[in-house]
Structure formats: structure tokens, C-alpha cells
A protein has these predicted regions:
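Surface-exposed loop and adjacent secondary-structure segments within mature catalytic domains
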Residues: 195-199
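Glycine-rich active-site loops that engage anionic ligands at enzyme catalytic sites
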Residues: 203
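Cofactor-pocket helix-loop regions in the catalytic cores of large enzyme subunits
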Residues: 1-187, 193, 206-397
């Protein structure tokens, strides 16, 4: 929706916002650092609404817990949106200046009445009404979610439904307001930033953009296909069709993490060639033709990690990896070398500097600055740039870029 896969706010903003919706997230247990900031916000007067089928330890801190039925997130979100519109609380200024499709959205959610939503979600109509009015009228408000929203067959629709609420009320592009996916594992954000996506190059640059692609072609000495690749679900479909016959799996265990484990095991086991690179022999590794033992990135490798507020921080090697294990970067570079490609990296910093030369949002993040400042948030366009705490302030500019 916004063009880059990252939370729009910083952790500090949760300390100074007026309302926080924690949806499908038990952050007290899964994101304790973030939750520490959230509790400061609560103590400073922010209202906290927890949306979760379970009354989690995070929900215990909430002013209101909305215990919805499993899988009814879209019905609840659309009912909140409808109530905001019915009460005349939508932010018409923001809608008119920065959005498309309001009338279509309004028509779509019209059937999601409070009574309908109560039947579908199990959440009392009064609680839905309270959240809708509180969210729309709060001077600053944010929605934060985790895997309770994204680990569903309709995960994309879940996320879009939540983003619609933020766009409807204008709670984005300003300090203290935004949408914030709390990443499910360490450095998931960093993986996306580096271009581990089917339609993006590093720095969330579109692979279908000829000018951007040409920049990477020149730097890497290759011709990048001018079309998006497969996402994970599409890869398994391609295996089933016979269009994908070889897989290099790094730090991923789909035999156990896929919803349909039986299908995943069958398809991965039937590949012509499967390589697994991981810190121990996983269930997926047991099916592999080649297993490459990797170092643990959190203790045995140099590099960076990026957290859920887009903050890039240095990781320093503390231990030598055991046995024949090597760090991921070294393994990948050696595989490339044996295939006739020379990346020219001598260190993790070399690879990082290559990224900085190609990704404008990382350009100002030298290792020196990361060390001195304890981390920086992207975008950070040059070595004088402080990094941006929140994203999309452009949506409030005249005219909107």
C-alpha cells in the first residue's frame, strides 16, 4: 500500500501516542523491548486496546480486550471502518488529499453492521463501537500487529483491512501515528530490506522498473529478469507443476513451518536438487541433497540486523563457529566463486557498502555511524542524515508527491 515493507513509526512514538491497538500480538512475551516502550505510553496516558482470541499477558494490560473468534479479523476491522463512517468520524481531509477508492471501500463495508460483526466475531457491539470512536477521535493513534494477523490463509487481506482503518482516519505520516508490523523473527525486516522478495530489489526498489534494474545490472554484471518472481506459496505451486525443480533453502524449515506440512515434505522431497543451509539439521535438511552447515548469525558472524522500527544495528562476532560451519555470507560467496562469479567481498562490511551504493535508503549508514550511534533507522540518505523516525510525511504535503 505504502511502497515499502516497514513499520511507519518508531518505538519511541508508542511512549507519546494517545491510543494503541495491539492486534494479534502478544508483544509482552514475543517483543519485550517494544512492549517496554508501549507500557511507558500506557503509563503516560495512552489507551490500549488488545484484539486477540486469547486473553494474553499483553491483553491483561489493556483498557479493553476484544476477544474475537479465530479468523474473524476482517469482519471486525470492516465493522470498525463502517462505524467510523456512519458516525461521520472519517478524516475527509486526508482521504481527499492522499487516497483513492474511498467510495468503493464505503460500499464494501456497508453490510458490516455492529450487529452483524457481533454475530461474526463474538465481540460485543458496544466494544466495537467504543474502539471505532476512540481510534477515529484520538489525536494520535497506531495499530500494531504480529503473526496473529499474518499467519493466515488470508493474511494479505487481514493486513489491508487494518491499513484501511489507518488511512480512513489519517493516522499515518505524523509523529505518534502509524501502522507497525512487529516482525515474527529476528531480522525478518532486514531480509526484506535486502531484496529477499519476489518483486523488489534491495531497498524496496521495483524489479519491473527499467531504470532501477539497469543500475543493478551494471553493478552486478548480470541481466536481471524484468518480471517479478514467485513468493513462497507460488514456489510450492511451481514445484507441483514441475516448473521449479531445484531449491536453495537458507535458514528456513518449510517442512515444519508450512501450513500443509505433508504437501511441503512431498514437494521438497521430490525436487531434482535441494540444498539446505542452516545452523543444525532441520526436517527440511533431512531431505536435502546437500547440507551446508552455517554459523549462528547472532553470535558467530559479523553483520547487521534490522528490527521492527527499521533500525539497523551492528552484530559482532563473539564466538568461532563449531566444526565445519561457516557464516552465511562466506558460504554464498564461495558457492558463487565455484560457479564462476566473483562477488569481491572480503568482509561483511564490503557487502554492506555495496548495498549502500545501490540502495538510497541505506546510503548514509556506514559501519562507523552504526557503531557510534548504536544504530540508525532507514531511510538514511547520506552521512549527515539522522534517519527518519516515521514514514510518509509526504502524504501531508501540498501537493502530495
Amino acid at each position: 500500500v505504502f511502497g515499502a515493507g516497514g513499520g511507519t513509526s518508531s518505538y519511541r512514538e508508542t511512549e507519546e501516542t494517545d491510543l494503541i491497538v495491539l492486534w494479534g500480538s502478544n508483544a509482552r512475551e514475543t517483543h519485550p523491548i517494544f512492549f517496554h516502550h508501549l507500557l511507558r505510553g500506557v503509563r503516560n496516558g495512552a489507551r490500549l486496546y488488545a484484539v486477540d482470541p486469547r486473553r494474553t499477558s499483553s491483553a491483561e494490560w489493556a483498557d479493553v480486550w476484544l476477544g474475537l473468534d479465530v479468523g474473524s479479523d476482517i469482519a471486525l476491522a470492516n465493522a470498525i471502518g463502517r462505524e467510523i463512517i456512519a458516525a461521520g468520524l472519517e478524516n475527509r481531509e486526508f482521504i481527499d488529499r492522499a487516497t483513492d477508492g474511498f467510495e468503493a471501500y464505503k460500499a464494501k463495508v456497508e453490510s458490516y453492521t455492529l450487529d452483524f460483526a457481533e454475530r461474526e466475531t463474538g465481540v460485543p457491539a458496544d466494544a466495537i463501537r467504543e474502539l471505532a470512536h476512540a481510534f477515529a477521535t484520538a489525536p494520535r493513534a497506531m495499530i500494531c500487529w504480529t503473526l496473529g494477523i499474518t499467519e493466515h490463509h488470508n493474511a494479505v487481506d487481514n493486513v489491508v483491512a487494518l491499513i484501511n482503518l489507518v488511512v480512513l482516519t489519517g493516522h499515518v505520516g505524523r509523529y505518534g501515528s502509524g501502522v507497525n508490523p512487529l516482525r515474527g523473527q529476528n531480522n525478518v525486516q532486514g531480509g526484506g530490506d535486502m531484496g529477499a522478495l519476489p518483486d523488489r530489489l534491495p531497498g524496496f526498489q521495483h524489479v519491473e522498473n527499467d531504470e532501477l534494474r539497469a543500475k543493478f545490472d551494471a553493478a552486478w554484471g548480470v541481466t536481471i529478469p524484468p518480471k517479478r518472481g514467485w513468493h513462497l506459496s507460488g514456489m510450492f505451486d511451481a514445484m507441483e507443476r514441475g516448473d521449479l525443480t531445484a531449491v536453495y533453502c537458507i535458514g528456513e524449515n518449510p517442512v515444519q513451518s508450512e501450513a500443509d506440512q505433508k504437501r511441503a515434505k512431498h514437494l521438497l522431497g521430490g525436487l531434482e536438487f535441494l540444498v539446505v543451509q542452516d545452523i543444525f539439521l532441520t526436517a527440511t535438511g533431512e531431505l536435502a541433497d546437500v547440507v551446508l552447515p552455517a554459523a549462528a548469525s547472532w553470535a558467530e558472524s559479523e553483520g547487521t540486523v534490522t528490527n521492527s522500527e527499521r533500525r539497523v544495528q551492528r552484530v559482532r562476532k563473539a564466538l568461532e563457529p563449531p566444526g565445519d560451519a561457516r557464516d552465511d555470507l562466506g558460504i554464498i560467496a564461495e558457492v558463487a566463486r565455484r560457479m564462476g562469479a566473483e562477488f569481491g567481498w572480503e568482509s561483511a562490511e564490503d557487502a554492506w557498502n555495496e548495498l549502500r551504493s545501490l540502495s538510497p535508503v541505506h546510503a548514509g549508514m556506514s559501519y562507523r555511524r552504526l557503531e557510534e550511534l548504536g544504530g540508525l533507522q532507514w531511510p538514511c540518505y547520506d552521512e549527515d542524515h539522522p534517519g527518519e523516525m516515521f514514514l510518509h510525511s509526504r502524504l501531508w504535503e501540498d501537493p502530495v508527491p
